[in-house]
């Protein structure tokens, strides 16, 4: 069976194109994030996997759970997912949608892990440097991980730059063992 992210891709692409064409990227993003959160609830998971409910009933129940925040196109999107038994894929659809949206907006979320706290001036300089290197607007999130020993790990999309002492020691150990 295919991976959930693979199954979600055409739906995320369709949602993104509909949102882009309607100039409603943020509205769709908010709706998909909310739908993904609803889908993660254990009672909702049971409802969505219930064989006694039809696709129409599942869609109606899901739309009710979303409240009044959905527009008609978003409700129709939910109905299409229900018709194809894909409502449980909302977390993956939302994840892919955010990726497409970031590409459209030429933005990227960058995660910076360091062994120690870094001052704001260094973070600003790093963000500027990454913006130039990646040719995208950078949103920098930081996390402290003392197990890195020193240095940093930078994750931007599917790119990882490991400049940590822990990473260098692991490479050295691997080289010495061969």
From Swiss-Prot:
GO cellular component, one term: proton-transporting ATP synthase complex
Subcellular localization: Cell inner membrane
Entry annotated with the keyword Ribonucleoprotein: no
Topology class, membrane: Peripheral membrane protein
One of the record's GO molecular function terms: proton-transporting ATP synthase activity, rotational mechanism
InterPro entries (UniProt xref): ATP_synth_OSCP/delta_N_sf, ATPase_OSCP/d_CS, ATPase_OSCP/dsu
Alphabetical UniProt keywords: ATP synthesis, Cell inner membrane, Cell membrane, CF(1), Hydrogen ion transport, Ion transport, Membrane, Transport
PANTHER family (UniProt xref): ATP SYNTHASE DELTA CHAIN
Family: Belongs to the ATPase delta chain family.
Subunit annotation: F-type ATPases have 2 components, F(1) - the catalytic core - and F(0) - the membrane proton channel. F(1) has five subunits: alpha(3), beta(3), gamma(1), delta(1), epsilon(1). F(0) has three main subunits: a(1), b(2) and c(10-14). The alpha and beta chains form an alternating ring which encloses part of the gamma chain. F(1) is attached to F(0) by a central stalk formed by the gamma and epsilon chains, while a peripheral stalk is formed by the delta and b chains.
Function: F(1)F(0) ATP synthase produces ATP from ADP in the presence of a proton or sodium gradient. F-type ATPases consist of two structural domains, F(1) containing the extramembraneous catalytic core and F(0) containing the membrane proton channel, linked together by a central stalk and a peripheral stalk. During catalysis, ATP synthesis in the catalytic domain of F(1) is coupled via a rotary mechanism of the central stalk subunits to proton translocation.
NCBIfam families recorded: ATP_synt_delta, PRK05758.2-2
Name of the protein in question: ATP synthase subunit delta
Gene that encodes it: atpH
